[in-house]
Curated annotation (Swiss-Prot):
Protein name as annotated: UPF0262 protein Meso_0189
Pfam families xrefs: UPF0262 (PF06793)
Protein source organism: Chelativorans sp. (strain BNC1)
Domain of life: Bacteria
Family: Belongs to the UPF0262 family.
Record NCBIfam families: PRK02853.1
InterPro entries: UCP032146
Regions crossing the membrane: none
């Protein structure tokens, strides 16, 4: 990110569209943790924005597309990017299946079985995070940890639909 200060190339607030509905408590907990972690530590800069942040981000679904609406700290609009959800569908579906297996395994499986399922879960999460980084390339600069937390929020939106 070069000369941009990390204090300016970051998110200070993340909001998920509440009109999509609520997810089960464990999914809502994941949402809250992802947002907390994201605001605490992130790298986020809309490409071409010379003024810099910090930024606020609203994530929503519009016409079955992912909408990332970026504003400045004071609320002035910066940019809205619309992304197709198609590249994420298989990953999210597989991720949910593995998560379901993971939560079932916690109750009855051996530690090595739980660890194997968790490795698969993390692998899918990493794949989704990389896909998001690829889709944001040329639009918004993010680091991998920021992409991971944003992917978690995309999964929450999918769950709510």
């Amino acid at each position: 990110m070069g000369e941009r200060s990390s204090a300016k190339a970051r998110l200070i607030d993340v909001e998920l569209d509440e009109t999509v509905g609520r997810a089960p408590p464990d999914v809502e907990h994941e949402r809250a943790v992802a947002i907390f972690d994201l605001v605490e530590e992130n790298t986020f800069h809309p490409v071409g924005d010379q003024a810099g942040g910090p930024y606020r981000l609203k994530i929503s679904l519009i016409d079955s597309r992912l909408a990332l609406s970026v504003t400045r700290e004071g609320g002035d609009p910066v940019v809205t990017h619309m992304l197709s959800l198609t590249p994420f569908r298989r990953i999210v579906k597989d991720y949910f299946l593995v998560c379901e297996s993971y939560y079932q395994a916690i109750r009855s499986a051996t530690p090595s079985q739980i660890e194997a399922i968790d490795m698969g879960r993390r692998g899918l999460h990493n794949e989704g995070s990389q896909t998001l980084m690829d889709r944001l390339n040329g639009k918004i600069e993010v680091d991998f940890n920021t992409a991971r937390r944003l992917f978690t929020l995309i999964c929450v939106l999918h769950w709510r639909r």
